[in-house]
Design a protein with these regions (language model features):
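Catalytic Walker B motif of ABC-type/P-loop ATPase nucleotide-binding domains
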Residues: 160-163
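ABC ATPase NBD coupling module
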Residues: 66-82, 106, 112-113, 226-229
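A short, proline-enriched helix->beta-strand linker immediately N-terminal to the Walker B motif
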Residues: 154-158
Length: 249
């Protein structure tokens, strides 16, 4: 049971974004893909739930190949994969309760009482009690982010995908979100795939780091190991030296 990317290729026009991208996300762990803005991180994350289709290669969730799925089978896979969007992506005209309840209502499996219970449980998990009736605009950026996590876990997914969970937040809120990512692993047992260019946050939450460079994974390993990796691309990224990064091939 895991998420696997096998030899993905993706281009937008002349822009080759993924070029032989392969990675396995082991069960129960937090795997983080790091790389600069524009390197293709969101693109690979979106292939997992069918928001972007690769030009070639395969994406697997457990035993299901998802890159070619459509309709109900794709929807079934999406239920097992919670997605925390970069800017929380809450619906502004809906209360926090309705935002978190949306996916649950769509399945039609729970009655309103059970949905209410699940929404409150999910908000408790992210330390957001008592905001059910508020609108997204009434919450701080960090609270909106947490509400986005609550919505992603409401269906009790097996996997959680986080797109830049800490980008644009103040340092204290970054720590809150980092702890939340760890808590989702520890309390819900979810397998997590995080993408970020925030290295400090990546060091804190990851069981495994994977560095994306020129459309493919350049290096995978334990966070403690990355500083000693003898590769100009890796060193260029972690030390913020664009010349090393760009010249590495
Ligand atoms: N839907 C799209 N249409 C055209 N170009 C896109 C689209 N999505 C992403 N791109 C381009 O693909 C590259 C990688 O984007 P993205 O995956 O969002 O990078 P990252 O998340 O690492 O910042 C960028 O050059 C971006 O402009
Ligand atoms: Mg992105």
């Amino acid at each position: 049971m895991s998420i696997r990317f096998v030899d993905l290729e993706k281009r937008f026009g002349d822009n080759v974004v993924l070029d032989g991208f392969s990675l396995e996300v082991p069960d129960g762990d937090i795997t983080t893909i790091i790389g600069p803005s524009g390197s293709g991180k969101s693109t690979c994350l979106k292939t997992v739930i069918g928001l972007i289709r690769p030009d070639a290669g395969e994406v697997w969730v457990d035993e299901r190949r998802v890159d070619t799925l459509e309709g109900d089978p794709l929807y079934e896979v999406r239920r097992t994969v919670g997605f925390v969007f970069q800017f929380a992506a809450l619906f502004d005209s809906m209360t926090i309760f309705d935002n978190v309840a949306m996916g649950l209502r769509r399945t039609g499996e729970l009655d309103e009482a059970a949905i209410g219970e699940r929404v409150r449980e999910s908000l408790d998990l992210v330390d957001l009690e008592g905001v059910e009736d508020k609108m997204p605009s009434q919450l701080s950026g960090g609270m909106r982010k947490r509400a986005g996590v609550a919505r992603a876990v409401a269906l009790r997914p097996q996997y959680l995908l986080y797109d830049e969970p800490t980008t644009g937040l103040d340092p204290v809120t970054v720590t809150v979100i980092d702890r939340l990512i760890l808590r989702m692993r520890d309390e819900l047992g979810v397998t997590s795939l995080v993408i970020t260019h925030d290295l400090e946050s990546a060091y804190r939450v990851s069981d495994r780091l994977a560095m994306l460079h020129q459309g493919r994974i350049r290096w995978v390993g334990a966070p403690e190991a990355i500083r000693d990796v003898d590769d100009p691309a890796v060193q260029g990224f972690i030390r913020g030296e664009p010349e090393l990064w760009e010249e590495a091939s």
